[in-house]
């Protein structure tokens, strides 16, 4: 009996995560059917999408052969906490009028909220209808939570990105730092990661648009995912899982904002050469 119990297989963390996300999706379907105009439906969808994004980022790291040990995880959490404090301090001490291009995504968020107030079908139909525009509403699926819990100002929209965009972006930045270190065969991995990760994370152009309520850095999650999955991969063997992630990241980066097509075409052309 003890032998049978010891040989019983347990679910991997990946399987548990997939089951949890699937259960969440089923719950959303039930809520959408039973309470189609519930105010909490869109925020719940947004929370689920952010969880899927974070799970996908972890899966990209796993597929790319990047492992985060305790030091890496502790550094990411510490830097994220520092980013929360920095954004709160920087946004609190300034006065900025959100107009013209700076109010564009905030207005899109309000429009998407109004569409979902009519029901799930109307909400998703509205988002899909913008996919051919320069500024799509794809990002609104991820920024509604925790934006829905704030005063819904320009500053609160910028601050909300620290919770729904930055965690997945930091995973990609950390993974890319480690991957490049692997390719360069870095000896002192501790200081290399600490210095390299802090430099890429504090790069001014990474956060400038986010501070102005423009979530352009959302697309960088998928750009860095593409880099992680292809930098040291030469298509010498078939890896369906990797191919699927590359396809999804490419589709997502195009949906996030159309001008990311310049990166997609330029990078894949250079990669092919």
Regions found by a protein language model. Give the residues of each.
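Short hydrophobic/aromatic helix or loop-helix immediately within or flanking a transmembrane segment
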Residues: 104-112, 120-152, 159-163
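Start-transfer (signal-anchor) and selected internal transmembrane alpha helices
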Residues: 1-88
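Perimembrane helix-loop-helix junctions
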Residues: 235, 263-273
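Membrane-interface alpha helices of multi-pass inner-membrane proteins
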Residues: 242-258, 269
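Short acidic/glycine- and proline-prone juxtamembrane loop motifs at membrane-interface regions
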Residues: 205-218
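Transmembrane-helix motifs of polytopic, lipid-linked glycan transferases
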Residues: 159-186, 225
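Helix-to-loop transition at the C-terminal end of transmembrane segments
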Residues: 34-39, 85-104, 211-213
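Membrane-interface transmembrane helices that cradle and orient dolichyl/undecaprenyl
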Residues: 11-14, 184-187, 223-243, 253
């Amino acid at each position: 009996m003890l032998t049978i119990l010891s040989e019983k297989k347990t679910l991997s963390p990946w399987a548990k995560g997939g089951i949890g996300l699937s259960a969440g999706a089923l719950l959303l379907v039930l809520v959408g059917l039973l309470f189609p105009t519930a105010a909490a439906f869109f925020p719940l969808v947004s929370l689920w999408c952010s969880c899927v994004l974070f799970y996908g980022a972890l899966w990209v790291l796993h597929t790319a052969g990047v492992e985060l040990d305790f030091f890496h995880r502790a550094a990411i959490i510490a830097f994220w906490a520092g980013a929360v404090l920095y954004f709160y301090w920087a946004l609190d001490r300034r006065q900025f009028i959100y107009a013209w291009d700076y109010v564009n995504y905030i207005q899109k968020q309000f429009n998407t909220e109004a569409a979902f107030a009519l029901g799930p079908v109307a909400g998703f139909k509205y988002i899909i209808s913008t996919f051919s525009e320069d500024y799509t509403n794809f990002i609104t699926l991820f920024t509604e939570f925790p934006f829905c819990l704030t005063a819904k100002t320009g500053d609160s929209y910028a601050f909300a990105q620290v919770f729904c965009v930055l965690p997945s972006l930091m995973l990609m930045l950390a993974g890319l730092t480690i991957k490049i270190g692997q390719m360069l065969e870095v000896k002192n991995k501790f200081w290399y990661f600490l210095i390299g990760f802090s430099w890429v994370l504090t790069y001014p152009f990474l956060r400038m648009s986010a501070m102005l309520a423009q979530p352009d850095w959302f697309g960088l999650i998928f750009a860095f995912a593409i880099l992680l999955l292809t930098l040291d991969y030469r298509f010498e063997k078939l890896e369906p899982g990797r191919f699927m992630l590359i396809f999804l990241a490419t589709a997502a980066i195009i949906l996030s904002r159309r001008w990311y097509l310049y990166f997609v075409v330029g990078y894949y052309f250079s990669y092919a050469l």
